[in-house]
Amino acid sequence: MKLLGKYVDKGMQGNVTLVPEESEDMWHAYNLIAKGDSVRSTTIRKVQNETATGSSTSSRVRTTLTIAVESIDFDTQACVLRLKGRNIEENQYVKMGAYHTLDLELNRKFELRKPEWDTIALERIEMACDPTQSADVAAVVMQEGLAHVCLITASMTLVRSKIEVSIPRKRKGSVQQHEKGLAKFYEQVMQSILRHVNFDVVKCVLIASPGFVRDQFYDYMFQQAVKMDYKLLLDNKSKFMLVHASSGFKHSLREILQDPAVLAKMSDTKAAGEVKALEQFYMMLQCEPAKAFYGKKHVLQAAESQAIETLLISDNLFRCQDVSLRKEYVNLVESIRDAGGEVKIFSSMHISGEQLAQLTGIAALLRFPMPELEDSDDDDDEDGAAGGVADSDSD
């Protein structure tokens, strides 16, 4: 998504101008636009013209309209977002208050104004417009003395760092100089990974090289991680994958990304963290049910006690038409983050999001047991107590 303009003041009033550039951007737009927002974009309108003789003709004209959104329809096949509402700005072709349907398409600019912006909507814009926010995969292509640290998104590859170090040749009597040069090179590559790879977003890090360079670097990196207590690397060791590449130049990425093993690893990167969180929830539900709850009522009660370690919430809940209910969910997310908890926002378009929807779209893993929540009466059908009817479809 391309951000052309953003004017949101401290009172959370204002507008943004965006251009969707790929299909995923239309999904972001669908999550951003809500009933009651105003959207301005170019459109085609059928206009009736009366001639001097009294007869009428119709023609199609391109114009720019601003509508107050009343309904939203997302056609995933055609990748078109249809917004229906009343015209709210003077226009030579369309009367004030007349209904019109705006079709938002790829590469068509639109301006979005909300009665009040919130943190979830602003985060969605940041994620959609910052390519590093959506880069699920990082890759280091390397050979002795040369490395490229890259981030890979659905549409582009970004070279975040190029490392070049002159390494003395391995000659008789000068092996030590060669090893010193290699250590210097490996250290710079490791520091570049720590600096440029956001492990909260990146789900897979490919280390690729000809020969044994990748293996030697991998061993060096995790020896140093243990020695220097680099928890970021140690906690994410499972995300690293060693693969063959013909060189340390960027063009070697093509062959790497065609490797069936790499493709299999990458196919699940988009929501790997969410899948893992959901698996942990189901496991906790079976082993320690007093530390796993789903349903709005129980989750809110746990949040009041600052007991939530991880919140699992569907993006579908932020699309609700009830403004006060949306605010309640936004406040919940903010309060959990303020208390040091983690929030996983699931896409309802992913299989893990569909599973979460079966648990009312909201669930939580707790820091400590709250058996009193299990005992609390729940007359609301939308809420479920931990240890109840949840069923894992992990196959």
From Swiss-Prot:
Top-rank taxon: Eukaryota
Expression sites by tissue: Expressed in ovaries and muscles (at protein level). Expressed throughout all development stages.
Chain intervals for the UniProt region annotation (Disordered): 371-395
Disruption phenotype: During spermatogenesis results in blockage of cell division preventing spermatocytes to enter meiosis and lack of spermatic individualization resulting in sterility. In germlines, increases transposable elements transcription at both mRNA and protein levels.
Name of the featured protein: Protein pelota
Upper lineage: Eukaryota, Metazoa, Ecdysozoa, Arthropoda, Hexapoda
Keywords: Cell cycle, Cell division, Cytoplasm, Meiosis, Metal-binding, Mitosis, Nucleus, Translation regulation
GO cellular component, as recorded: cytoplasm; cytosol; Dom34-Hbs1 complex; nucleus
Cofactor: a divalent metal cation
Encoding gene, per UniProt annotation: pelo
Acidic residues biased stretches: 372-384
Cytoplasm recorded as keyword: yes
Molecular function GO labels: metal ion binding; RNA endonuclease activity
Positions of short motif PGF motif: 210-212
Function as written in the Swiss-Prot or TrEMBL entry: Component of the Pelota-HBS1L complex, a complex that recognizes stalled ribosomes and triggers the No-Go Decay (NGD) pathway. In the Pelota-HBS1L complex, pelo recognizes ribosomes stalled at the 3' end of an mRNA and engages stalled ribosomes by destabilizing mRNA in the mRNA channel. Following ribosome-binding, the Pelota-HBS1L complex promotes recruitment of pix, which drives the disassembly of stalled ribosomes, followed by degradation of damaged mRNAs as part of the NGD pathway.
Subunit structure, interactors included: Component of the Pelota-HBS1L complex, also named Dom34-Hbs1 complex, composed of pelo and HBS1. Interacts with Pink1 and Cnot4; the interaction with Cnot4 appears to be Pink1-dependent.
GO terms for biological process, alphabetical: compound eye morphogenesis; female germ-line stem cell asymmetric division; germ-line stem cell population maintenance; male germ-line stem cell population maintenance; meiotic cell cycle; meiotic nuclear membrane disassembly; meiotic spindle organization; nonfunctional rRNA decay
